């Protein structure tokens, strides 16, 4: 999945650059510029659909990558793991600020609700929110800075990816048995390159199918309506890949408690290398750990479903 994530990153940067060439980061023009792209720009509809659905595949790959790392004990490469968690946080931030850019109803209200969570921080909360917004509500300055961040963060992500790979190169990658694989090493090409092409094709086919046949399947219909600060949508919710965290946030009545639980649901990954007590690295021969692992997976799927 690491290779697939790299491919996702390249696809997102290339399609994103092409979209940025036609996009206008202004509240009065943003929605119209996206509509113009889909109607008048050569293959603009396809580029936009690939970019929007590419984000979903990016998250599918990163969640599978993290799940596999948990299952096979890859978190014992502490530096690689911690940079991986920082990469996840960067990806989440990038996806969030990018969701605001088309300036539809859910873009606007999603930005308002999520940035407003900073106000739960004692003493500095309200100041922080107003500083983030560039005013007293989500408006033109917010859109401008969010687009700037959305343009910048993928390159930060690419830099962190190189650091991630550098630390991985120190130890070598892990495998299902969780034992050193020095004696089993084989040439990268043609063995791994062939294996990777299979994964690439298996990801590309569903992505292209989704982008061509049902590009709006995972999007929110509210985003076909231009942002209107005077009309609140009946259900404010983020994209599907944030729903598990959003369910945790919404399930706690206290605002600060919800924000802390939301943050903890992702930041708990930093603790995992310190919680490993088994003499075996991988879960291959640990049935009780396997039960806990699959319970976690079921939990995340149920949270996503409930939140939807």
From Swiss-Prot:
Family classification: Belongs to the cytochrome b family.
Amino-acid positions noted as binding a ubiquinone in the UniProt annotation, renumbered to this chain: 169
Protein's recorded name: Cytochrome b
Listed InterPro entries: Cyt_b/b6_C (IPR005798), Cyt_b/b6_C_sf (IPR036150), Cyt_b/b6_N (IPR005797), Cytb/b6-like_sf (IPR027387), Cytochrome_b_C_euk/bac (IPR048260), Cytochrome_b_N_euk/bac (IPR048259), Di-haem_cyt_TM (IPR016174)
Cofactor: heme b
Assembly and interaction partners: The cytochrome bc1 complex contains 11 subunits: 3 respiratory subunits (MT-CYB, CYC1 and UQCRFS1), 2 core proteins (UQCRC1 and UQCRC2) and 6 low-molecular weight proteins (UQCRH/QCR6, UQCRB/QCR7, UQCRQ/QCR8, UQCR10/QCR9, UQCR11/QCR10 and a cleavage product of UQCRFS1). This cytochrome bc1 complex then forms a dimer.
Molecular function via GO: metal ion binding; ubiquinol-cytochrome-c reductase activity
One Pfam match: Cytochrom_B_C
Cofactor remark from the record: Binds 2 heme b groups non-covalently.
One GO cellular component, as annotated: mitochondrial inner membrane
Subcellular location: Mitochondrion inner membrane
UniProt binding sites for heme b b566: 65, 164
Miscellaneous comment in the UniProt entry for this protein: Heme 1 (or BL or b562) is low-potential and absorbs at about 562 nm, and heme 2 (or BH or b566) is high-potential and absorbs at about 566 nm.
Stated role: Component of the ubiquinol-cytochrome c reductase complex (complex III or cytochrome b-c1 complex) that is part of the mitochondrial respiratory chain. The b-c1 complex mediates electron transfer from ubiquinol to cytochrome c. Contributes to the generation of a proton gradient across the mitochondrial membrane that is then used for ATP synthesis.
Principal subcellular localisation of the protein: mitochondrion
């Amino acid at each position: 999945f690491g290779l697939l994530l790299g491919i996702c990153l390249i696809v997102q940067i290339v399609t994103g650059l092409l979209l940025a060439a036609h996009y206008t980061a202004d509240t009065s023009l943003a929605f119209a510029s996206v509509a113009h792209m889909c109607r008048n720009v050569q293959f603009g509809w396809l580029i936009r659909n690939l970019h929007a659905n590419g984000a979903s595949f990016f998250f599918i790959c990163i969640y599978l990558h993290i799940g596999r790392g948990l299952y096979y004990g890859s978190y014992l490469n502490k530096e690689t793991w911690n940079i991986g968690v920082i990469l996840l946080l960067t990806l989440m931030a990038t996806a969030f600020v990018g969701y605001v850019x088309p300036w539809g109803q859910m873009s606007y209200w999603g930005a308002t609700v999520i940035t407003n969570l900073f106000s739960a921080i004692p003493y500095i909360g309200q100041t922080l929110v107003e500083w983030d917004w560039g005013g007293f509500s989500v408006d033109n300055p917010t859109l401008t800075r969010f687009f700037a961040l959305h343009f910048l963060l993928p390159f930060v992500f690419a830099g962190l990816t190189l650091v991630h790979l550098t630390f991985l190169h120190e130890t070598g990658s892990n495998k299902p048995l969780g034992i050193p694989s020095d004696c089993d090493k084989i040439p990268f090409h043609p063995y791994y390159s062939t294996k990777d092409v299979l994964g690439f094709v298996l990801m590309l086919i569903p992505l292209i199918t989704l982008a061509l046949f049902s590009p709006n399947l995972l999007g929110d219909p509210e985003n076909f309506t231009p942002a209107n600060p005077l009309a609140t949508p009946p259900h404010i919710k983020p994209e599907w890949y944030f729903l598990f965290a959003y369910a945790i946030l919404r399930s706690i009545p206290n605002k600060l408690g919800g924000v802390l639980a939301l943050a903890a649901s992702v930041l708990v990954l930093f603790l995992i290398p310190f919680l490993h007590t088994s003499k075996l690295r991988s879960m291959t021969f640990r049935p009780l750990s396997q039960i806990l692992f699959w319970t976690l997976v079921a939990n995340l799927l149920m949270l996503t479903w409930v939140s939807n």
